């Protein structure tokens, strides 16, 4: 809903004196005065003043032969077309007349603007001029008409489909003019997607020839459009696919990053078909242009990096072992640095590990907190991925422990948990630091990691029971995550060291968990342990609790099926979010409908306000003075066509929609990839 | 594709907007800034594409405005972001500067442009020169019949017919920007050359141009050798006027140029570049109360070349004060707002070495972890005319205009400058 405040400022009453001054200008006998007045009206409209009472006066200027003035009035109309379309119907005769003009600019302008008036009634007036415009001799008009068809389709599918407009649009795909072709395929693609079963736009091989010609003649935006249509082309014939890809390759050299990435998309869609030779050739062609995208504006770089991430998962060897190009620049925005770190991790391998590690070491002393944290995580991942580098990583971690800056120490502790799972023998190196580190840990993640380390290695850490008892002393105030970790840790402690030295500690924790804690998970787990720890079960308990852990390995890749789906979505938002479109564009039709409803509702409210303003205004009688032949069109108080949904209904619809928030499709972190029993007991 | 385009100021207030599709409530724009800061809070940074309740926010930031596109579909993110950048360029071409004020001063023109560059959320054209032919600022000149420029829909969408110059000339600038990150010990961690060939075309009619470079791939393919070096470009990008298929076939760069100034091509080489200007910086803290810097700068390029307007930006502790500088050349300024000193040298000849000494006071209350001082790199700015790092050369620029048959002169200049990142880590 529009907040009160916003509404009131938007519909601020326009000062009387100003209005009358503008009014005078609008009906002046001099063209330049009228132009000036319309301009000032538009300016007033933009800063949120309500100038709808001037509507009839502005409209009087529409019949002019002066193209500058006409354009201005159209601009005014477009802005009000949204809020009160029925007023715009008043102008419809002029539109129809303009669409017959000698000057192509005017014809195109009329068709374009008419399409912007979102009211069903317009369709009747639009049909004939649009039909003519689709066959207009001037490409500028045809290009506007091609888009107008999808505008009409949006208003009334039935009408548009049953009156031959779609067929006419389909015919434009073989128009001699490349820009017209581009707009036609774009409109068709959209119409097709709204109702895929009708099959309005199936790209077939015979069509690709025409598209290829247009591709090499089109402006940059047309090229993107045509490349996207080529990405819709599906074939099982390798020859056909090869032909398409070969002819798309030159587009890698285009200066527009959008063209380059769209060309990549066409290739990626078809690449599973090809022999390894041709695949190699294509990837080799693709790599340098992808890297060049990294020297563009940051936002564009960001989209490129997200897409490179996907392609790299499919084809890890695409850039050989070139990590350097992905090294972070000091002036890179944070969101770029984070993406680059991910890619550096993905590329890490024995060949480039030395430069990778020394680069990551340099990042640790950078300024931005989030970046440093991510770097530390990245170092841990690299250590999992490339075993030969574990000692270097540990020594960097120990350096950080030396420095003793708390947020870094905490992050290292979290990462250490994972690293130690894979390389348990490295615990020895850590021993001297533990008691000091423990004081720096505030973050729950870090504290529970520390608890895990103390429990798991209680037999090697001489001070483990002392340190754990310190942590337990504040157990009641800790997060659940830490409490669970502590519980498991003391059980491990007692089972590993045997002898019952730590019996007291275990009892204390169990006692707290069973009798004092109100959390079910904690209590249930405590009960389970309690039963395990009875003397007759101790051996079994040892077997279960101190068992061999499944090993962890680095794998941050998306699931195969998701990856393949996303590779067909390159350049789109889906490829940026790494989520399927269904998960963020609202649950199918339902979400989209709810949004649409809200849009309509908002319009209606605005409209109601404006109607009120007009009715109050002194100009109402002027409306009747206008010389319009269509009597039905003159009633200014026509009820809006699209009726408002009851407010409560729509709200609940929105709520429901929100409940459908996209489920995260991100892969589980490596740490969490433990076996089920492991999870159950929080080992 | 976009449902609506907004220009917002930094406070999130809408300056101007255009609703192209009427399929989303325009009020969702109020969510933009809160959403952005929420994301920032959550993960420490924001990204150029955000999604919330089925609405996608795609935006760029320029001076004191955001350009924002909204969409409820799975739009082409790359296309939208490039489009927003190009839209900013169009505004800059029209108003010289894109900022809140220039938008406010030109509402009408902005509406007119928004109407022309996009239709129903589909980008149409962003070629300023063509737009300027029929969307003009001189609002009072009333043109009775202004047909749309043929170029709008033509295969040659960047040049109009009937251009005439008394003197036909082409100016060609080869500009190389060097990005370099080096470690303090002199090893180059990352380096790349981003080259650009910029043309200023003052040619009549529809001239046909062909550009010849000392391109290694071209000469190897032709099996020829030429005097001097050839260069190997890792990747090349062309202005849309260049025939890409022809380049793919035989590496010929042929085109009909737009009128006036434009970037014909850009290229990238990630070959190892030796630092052109090297800076060594040593600092000593004396008894905790003052810090002393000894800086040496060395020009490592050809002796007969001269670097102009060299700027060496050296980070200093944030709490330092009362600076004193001594230098053999140029002058030094203290820039407390970036916690750095800036050493300016007007002319820096190849092979020369300059020195600078600086001393600054440190506050008596000492920062506990001085060794934890976050390290910032030394950054450099410079321009070296008549010099390219890559050794690229323009061998010829052939100009033919089949109808007018005039003789035109090409002029070529070269310059090497710093890229967005030229830094030496400390």
Swiss-Prot record, chain A:
A GO molecular function held by the record: clathrin binding
**Entry keywords, A to Z:** Cell membrane, Coated pit, Membrane, Phosphoprotein, Protein transport, Transport
Organism domain of life: Eukaryota
List where in the cell it is found. Answer: Cell membrane; Membrane, Coated pit
Membrane topology qualifier: Peripheral membrane protein
In-chain residues carrying the UniProt-annotated modification Phosphoserine: 675
Region (Disordered) residue spans: 629-649
Q: Which GO terms describe its biological process?
A: endosome to plasma membrane protein transport; retrograde transport, endosome to Golgi
InterPro entries according to UniProt? AP_beta, AP_complex_bsu_1_2_4, ARM-like, ARM-type_fold, Clathrin/coatomer_adapt-like_N
Family from the record:
Belongs to the adaptor complexes large subunit family.
* Function noted in UniProt: Adaptins are components of the adaptor complexes which link clathrin to receptors in coated vesicles. Clathrin-associated protein complexes are believed to interact with the cytoplasmic tails of membrane proteins, leading to their selection and concentration. The AP-1 complex interacts directly with clathrin.
Q: What subunit structure does UniProt give?
A: Adaptor protein complex 1 (AP-1) is a heterotetramer composed of two large adaptins (gamma-type subunit apl4 and beta-type subunit apl2), a medium adaptin (mu-type subunit apm1) and a small adaptin (sigma-type subunit aps1). AP-1 interacts with clathrin.
Q: What is this protein called?
A: AP-1 complex subunit beta-1
Q: Which organism is it from?
A: Schizosaccharomyces pombe (strain 972 / ATCC 24843)
Gene from which this protein is expressed: apl2
From Swiss-Prot, chain B:
Give the organism's phylogenetic lineage.
Answer: Eukaryota, Fungi, Dikarya, Ascomycota, Taphrinomycotina
MHD domain segment(s): 167-425
The entry's localization annotation reads:
Cytoplasmic vesicle, Clathrin-coated vesicle membrane; Membrane, Clathrin-coated pit
Q: What is the annotated signal peptide range for this record?
A: none
Q: Name one GO biological process term.
A: Golgi to endosome transport
Q: Entry's InterPro entries?
A: Adaptor_comp_med_subunit (IPR050431), AP2_Mu_C_sf (IPR036168), AP_mu_sigma_su (IPR022775), Clathrin_mu (IPR001392), Clathrin_mu_CS (IPR018240), Longin-like_dom_sf (IPR011012), MHD (IPR028565)
Checking Gene3D superfamilies in the record gives: 3.30.450.60, Mu homology domain, subdomain B
**According to its record, how does it sit in the membrane?**
Peripheral membrane protein
Any one Gene Ontology MF annotation carried by this entry is: clathrin adaptor activity
Q: Which GO terms describe its cellular component?
A: AP-1 adaptor complex; cell division site; cell tip; clathrin-coated pit; clathrin-coated vesicle; cytosol; endosome; Golgi apparatus
Record has Lyase as a keyword = no
Keywords assigned by UniProt, alphabetized: Coated pit, Cytoplasmic vesicle, Membrane, Protein transport, Transport
Question: What is this protein called in UniProt?
Answer: AP-1 complex subunit mu-1
Q: Which residues form a coiled coil?
A: none
Q: How does it assemble?
A: Adaptor protein complex 1 (AP-1) is a heterotetramer composed of two large adaptins (gamma-type subunit apl4 and beta-type subunit apl2), a medium adaptin (mu-type subunit apm1) and a small adaptin (sigma-type subunit aps1). AP-1 interacts with clathrin. Interacts with sad1.
Query: Would the keyword Membrane be found if you checked this record's keyword annotation?
Result: yes
Write down a Pfam family by its short name.
Clat_adaptor_s
What family does this chain come from, according to its entry? Belongs to the adaptor complexes medium subunit family.
* Species annotation: Schizosaccharomyces pombe (strain 972 / ATCC 24843)
- Main role? Component of the adaptor complexes which link clathrin to receptors in coated vesicles. Clathrin-associated protein complexes are believed to interact with the cytoplasmic tails of membrane proteins, leading to their selection and concentration.
